[in-house]
Structure formats: C-alpha cells, structure tokens
Design a protein with these regions (language model features):
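Juxtamembrane boundary at the C-terminal end of a transmembrane helix
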Residues: 124-135
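Cytosolic, membrane-interface loops and tails of multi-pass inner-membrane proteins
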Residues: 26-52
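N-terminal signal-anchor transmembrane alpha helix
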Residues: 8-36
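Core segments of transmembrane alpha-helices
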Residues: 56-68, 119
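Juxtamembrane loop-transmembrane helix junctions in multi-pass integral membrane proteins
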Residues: 1-8, 46, 50-56, 72, ...
C-alpha cells in the first residue's frame, strides 16, 4: 500500500501546509534583508511578528498532521478528517494573519481554538479507538 492510498486525506493537508509555509518563510527572509538583521529580531517589531507567526505555524502544524495521520490509519471517518483538517487550516491561516497584522485580537483566539480543536479531535479519536471505545 502506498502513502496516497493509506492516507488519502492527510496527504492532501500535508501538501497544502507545506505550500503555505513557503510564503511565510519568504516573508521572514525578506524582512531580514530589509532590516539587515541576520539573526534574532534586532528589535524590529515587524520581523518579530513574522518570526512568531511562522514559528507558531511550524510548532503546531507538524504534530497536528502526525495526529491526523494516526487517526486516518486508525480508521477515522473521512468527514472527521476533512473537518478537523479544515479547522486546522483555517485556524492556522487566521492565526497567522492576525499575528502579522495586529499581533493581537479576536482572530488570534479564533485561530488557536480552531487549531486546538484538531489537536483534541485527532488524538482523541486514536485514544478512544485504542481503548476499544466505539467511535
């Protein structure tokens, strides 16, 4: 069995998140060039916002995708995978946009709630399935 047939939903989200990370990485790099700050943030608030938005993305997305893959391998229904993956995607986009624009606000909280919902949903399914609870 190949990865596409084993993880048909997760693999789509892996590809989408990988592509989304490219402009985030480029935004940090471009700001570094503009400010001549090769390391850390140099006291530049815009660079710091971009770094943290990118950093938060890279801190949360990989573990969420691993949990999603585990849920898919454990037999999670596609509706659960698509809804959890979409919540993660929307959550990360809203959170990123809020951090790089204002840094604070309702969008940031909504983004984290959507992200956390997938971080509860996927491993929750796996644990229930592992414990033999009907899901």
């Amino acid at each position: 069995m190949d990865i596409i047939s084993a993880l048909p939903v997760t693999i789509v989200f892996v590809a989408v998140f990988a592509l989304i990370q490219i402009p985030m990485t480029v935004a940090v790099g471009l700001r570094r060039l503009q400010t001549d700050v090769p390391f850390m943030d140099g006291g530049d608030s815009v660079l710091l916002q971009r770094m943290r938005a990118h950093g938060n993305f890279t801190e949360t997305v990989p573990i969420a995708l691993l949990a999603m893959a585990a849920a898919e391998l454990a037999g999670a229904p596609h509706v659960l995978l698509w809804s959890g993956g979409t919540a993660l995607l929307l959550g990360r986009l809203v959170h990123y946009a809020t951090i790089v624009t204002t840094g604070f606000g309702t969008g940031r909280a909504i983004g984290m709630l959507l992200t956390l919902s997938s971080l509860v949903l996927f491993p929750g399914f796996v644990l229930l399935k592992t414990l033999g609870v009907a899901v």
